């Protein structure tokens, strides 16, 4: 019984991951999958360079 639940749970998580990645690909079809987030496609994307600059400024 535990094995069946584990297999079903794993399959469910795999499907969520697959459809989640498909939704990202549809939202920005010309994006490079190895590149970071495209700020033009996602206006709420995290700006890592700005965060790094702020941390460097705060920490000296």
Curated annotation (Swiss-Prot):
Residues 1-27 form the signal peptide. AXPX repeats lie at residues 27-30, 31-34, 35-38, 41-44. It is found in: Secreted; Target cell membrane. One of its GO terms (molecular function) is toxin activity. Expressed by the venom gland. It comes from the Eukaryota. GO terms for cellular component: extracellular region; membrane; other organism cell membrane. The modification Leucine amide is found at residue 59. Its main location: secreted. Residues 28-45 form a propeptide. Keywords: Amidation, Antibiotic, Antimicrobial, G-protein coupled receptor impairing toxin, Immunity, Innate immunity, Mast cell degranulation, Membrane, Repeat, Secreted, Signal, Target cell membrane, Target membrane, Toxin. GO terms for biological process: defense response to bacterium; innate immune response. The primary structure of this mature peptide is identical to that of Mastoparan-VT1 from Vespa tropica (AC P0DQZ4), and mastoparan-like peptide 12c from Vespa magnifica (AC A0SPI0). Antimicrobial and mast cell degranulating peptide. Has broad spectrum antibacterial activity against both Gram-positive (S.aureus MIC=32-64 ug/ml, S.xylosus MIC=2 ug/ml, and S.alactolyticus MIC=16 ug/ml) and Gram-negative bacteria (C.koseri MIC=4 ug/ml, E.coli MIC=8 ug/ml, K.pneumoniae MIC=48 ug/ml, P.aerugiosa MIC=128 ug/ml, S.choleraesuis MIC=32 ug/ml, S.typhimurium MIC=32 ug/ml, and V.parahamelytics MIC=64 ug/ml). Affects membrane permeability of E.coli. Shows hemolytic activities on sheep, chicken and human erythrocytes. Belongs to the MCD family. Mastoparan subfamily. This is Mastoparan-M. It comes from Vespa mandarinia.
